[in-house]
C-alpha cells in the first residue's frame, strides 16, 4: 500500500500545493523493490531490509539509503508500512514526545478509513491507543548521530485491509503531519 499511497500523496499535493508549503519532500515509493516485486517482506535474498539500517548492512538498498540519509540530513522521516499481523492502525513514536505529538493526529486522520489497533501489546511492544514508544533495532531512521534529531514516525496499516483504504489512510495520515 505504501507505493500506492506515495503516488496518491503526490497527486494530491500537485492539485493542492499549499498543503506542502514550507516543506521540501523527498518521497521514496519503496525501499525494497525486489521484495515488492516478489510480494515478500524480505528482499531477493530473503533479508528484511527494515532491520538492517545503521548495523553495517551489506545490502545495496540499505547502503544507498544510508548514504542519502547522511547527505540530506532530513528534518523528518515518515515511513509507511502495512503489517500483516495487526488488527488496525498504529504507529511508532520511537520514545520521543515530538514524534508522539505528530503521530496522534496522523492516526486520527487515518482512522477515517480504517479502525485503530487498540490492543495493549502490538508487534511485541506496549502500546497506548495505537502509539508504540519503542521499536525494533535496524528500522529505517535518520543517522544515529544526526543532530538535531529529526522527527521520525512509522505509520502502520493492516495489510489485510483493501489496498485503496490503506493508501487513503496513509495519505491522510501524512497530510495531518504536514498540517501540524
What are these regions (language model features)?
Residues 1-180:
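Structured catalytic-domain cores with a bias toward divalent-metal coordination
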Amino acid at each position: 500500500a505504501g507505493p500506492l499511497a506515495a503516488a496518491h500523496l503526490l497527486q494530491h499535493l500537485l492539485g493542492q500545493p499549499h498543503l506542502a508549503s514550507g516543506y521540501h519532500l523527498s518521497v521514496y515509493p519503496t525501499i525494497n523493490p525486489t521484495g515488492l516485486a516478489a510480494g515478500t517482506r524480505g528482499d531477493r535474498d530473503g533479508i528484511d531490509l527494515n532491520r538492517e539500517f545503521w548495523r553495517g548492512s551489506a545490502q545495496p538498498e540499505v547502503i544507498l539509503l544510508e548514504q542519502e540519509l547522511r547527505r540530506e540530513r532530513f528534518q523528518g522521516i515518515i515511513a509507511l508500512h502495512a503489517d500483516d499481523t495487526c488488527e488496525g492502525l498504529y504507529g511508532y513514536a520511537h520514545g520521543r514526545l515530538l514524534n508522539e505529538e505528530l503521530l496522534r493526529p496522523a492516526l486520527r486522520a487515518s482512522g477515517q478509513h480504517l479502525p485503530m489497533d487498540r490492543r495493549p501489546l502490538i508487534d511485541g511492544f506496549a502500546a497506548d491507543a495505537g502509539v508504540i514508544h519503542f521499536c525494533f533495532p535496524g528500522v529505517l531512521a535518520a543517522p544515529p548521530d544526526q543532530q538535531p534529531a529529526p522527527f521520525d514516525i512509522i505509520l502502520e496499516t493492516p495489510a489485510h485491509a483493501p489496498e485503496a483504504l490503506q493508501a487513503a489512510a496513509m495519505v491522510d495520515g501524512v497530510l495531518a503531519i504536514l498540517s501540524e
